[in-house]
A protein has these predicted regions:
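Signal-transducing coupling segments at domain and membrane junctions
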Residues: 100-105, 112, 117-143, 165-175
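Signal-transmission linkers at sensory-effector interfaces
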Residues: 1-36, 43-44, 197-203
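Flexible loop/coil segments at beta-strand boundaries within sensory signal-transduction domains
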Residues: 58-59, 150-156, 165-168, 182, ...
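A short, aliphatic-rich beta-strand micro-motif
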Residues: 142-151, 158
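GAF sensory/regulatory domain recognition
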Residues: 51-98, 121-122, 160
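Signal-transmission/dimerization alpha-helices at domain junctions
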Residues: 109-113, 159, 182-203
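Short, hydrophobic-rich beta-strand element in sensory/regulatory alpha-beta domains
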Residues: 39-42, 48-56, 60-64, 104-106, ...
């Protein structure tokens, strides 16, 4: 790739981030904001699976707001009108300690992005739920990216989880690259600010 081509790609990314930032800042419907965030995450990574969680006002749980898996033609929450009936995730255990067992609760509690190449080879987090889902459906969870939505005050308002990035040419599952992660971190920050502003207006 030539320097000119690299510059063109960079300019396109900056323009796209500006466009999505404007869209997020002017939208009033919170469900549409959810969809804008996750739709752009899909554009950046070509991820097959996407889940968006929002942290409760008491900061003890995370509610599922969007769940989607392209290859299974599955979508709930957001603007679909289909309620997600999965219980919220607990951010603390019974003793009051931060729950770091799953990558999304870890991201919520620490503010750190987690990028995993293969969930089945990962020893640091509990992927029992994903493996059970895979066993029941024939799916194969592989690459996983968990990103906290951190606003301008450094408060974490939610977490975005992306599953199975896809190569746009071959369609094969690939890892989330460092470049993808950087762009998603930027998107998550924009989304967090928009959601925080929406909550402030609602109050």
């Amino acid at each position: 790739m030539t320097l000119k081509e690299k510059c063109a790609i960079l300019e396109d990314r900056v323009k796209r981030l500006q466009e999505i930032g404007l869209a997020l800042s002017t939208e009033d419907d919170i469900n549409v904001i959810f969809e804008l965030i996750m739709g752009e995450a899909k554009n950046i990574t070509n991820a097959d699976g996407r889940t968006l969680y929002m942290i409760s006002d008491d900061a003890k749980t995370m509610k599922f707001e969007i769940m989607a898996t392209e290859s299974m033609n599955f979508a709930q929450g957001g603007t679909t009108g289909i309620e997600i009936k999965i219980p919220p995730m607990q951010l603390f255990d019974e003793e009051g300690n931060p729950n770091h067992s799953s990558i999304v609760t870890y991201s919520a509690n620490t503010g750190k992005t987690v990028n995993i190449k293969d969930a089945y080879k990962e020893k640091g987090f509990d992927f029992t739920g994903a493996k059970t889902f895979d066993k029941n459906t024939g799916y194969r969870t592989q690459s996983v990216l968990s990103v906290p939505l951190k606003n301008h005050e450094n408060d974490i308002v939610g977490v975005m989880q992306l599953i199975n990035a896809k190569d746009p040419q071959s369609g094969k599952t690939i890892s989330f690259s460092a470049d993808m992660q950087y762009q998603i971190d930027s998107l998550a920050s924009q989304g967090a600010v928009a959601l925080t502003n929406k909550r402030l207006v609602a109050e």
